[in-house]
A protein has these predicted regions:
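Ser/Thr/Pro/Gly-rich low-complexity linker/stalk segments immediately outside membranes or between
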Residues: 47-63
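Sequence context surrounding c-type heme c attachment/ligation sites in exported
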Residues: 60-112, 160-250
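N-terminal intrinsically disordered, acidic low-complexity segments at the extreme N-terminus
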Residues: 1-13
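Hydrophobic membrane-insertion alpha-helices, especially the h-region
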Residues: 27-46
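Short, charged, low-hydrophobicity "junction" segments
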Residues: 51-55, 154, 180
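Structured, soluble extracytoplasmic/luminal domains of envelope-associated proteins
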Residues: 97-154, 158-159
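Cytosolic juxtamembrane amphipathic/interface segments immediately preceding
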Residues: 12-25
């Protein structure tokens, strides 16, 4: 109005199209963007779903603190002394408290040198007392009281119901070390899940692991026949049928 009053001619503004309208009118750009968003969404959803049930590094607090470092590391107790079922059965099993008492009838406290900055001698001694309470053991009279309490251990390694895994096949027949799947247990103060235990992880191991035939005439015969078939000097678990669906799923 001021410009008109002074006789000044003002150029009219050219109307511009909003960016979102211009984008909406460009069908090619809309198509490309939609495809990109769909693919990106599928990628992130797939990544999320693939992690469901994967509990790598899971280290729950147990009702009785059990140090694998002290038992398997410092005292060099063989894994299969406590997990004896791993030699002959599908499951490694949680050792019964009677197995613990094989030693702890005599060992009622730890040495002074066992203490660490994180865990005191008193703490470890308290865990042994928890064991005595659970089994109903009177350390003074060196006898059982008959009053026991179940220990509700928190499971760490938990495969889906549709997965079959046989410990004896791996430990006894294949001669696989426990640390291959469970990590350097002898150094763990708190037990955790070392490996992802996914299908891809198992298959990768089967493809890379050579079959041990020493002392196994059955495997030696199969190895002789299959090595000729595949034209290789050494067979992997995969070439021995380790990738067949029915071996792990039923």
């Amino acid at each position: 109005k001021v410009a008109k009053a002074n006789g000044i001619e003002v150029a009219s503004k050219t109307p511009t199209t909003p960016i979102w309208k211009a984008f909406a009118k460009n069908q090619f750009l809309v198509l490309v963007t939609s495809i990109f968003l769909l693919l990106a969404s599928a990628y992130f959803v797939y990544g999320y779903l693939m992690q469901v049930g994967v509990d790598q590094e899971y280290a729950p607090i147990q009702p009785i603190h059990f140090s694998h470092k002290i038992h398997a590391g410092d005292n060099e107790i063989n894994c299969k002394y406590c997990h004896s079922a791993a030699r002959v059965s599908k499951n490694a099993g949680i050792p019964s408290l009677n197995v613990c008492m094989n030693c702890h009838k005599s060992v009622s406290e730890v040495a002074e040198t066992t203490a660490t900055p994180e865990y005191s001698k008193e703490f470890y001694d308290e865990q042994i007392q928890k064991l005595y309470t659970a089994v109903g053991w009177d350390s003074e009279t060196q006898s059982y009281t008959g009053k026991s309490q179940p220990v509700k251990w928190v499971r760490i390694h938990n495969l889906p119901d549709f997965v079959y895994f046989n410990h004896s096949q791996h430990v006894t027949v294949a001669g696989i070390e426990c640390q291959t799947c469970h990590g350097p247990v002898e150094g763990y103060e708190v037990q955790k899940q070392f490996a992802p235990l996914t299908m891809g992880w198992c298959i990768d191991c089967h493809r890379k692991t050579d079959v041990k035939m020493e002392g196994n005439a059955y495997y030696a015969k199969i190895h002789e026949e299959l090595s000729k078939k595949y034209g290789v000097d050494k067979l992997t678990a995969a070439q021995m049928g380790g990738l067949e669906c029915g071996k792990c799923h039923y």
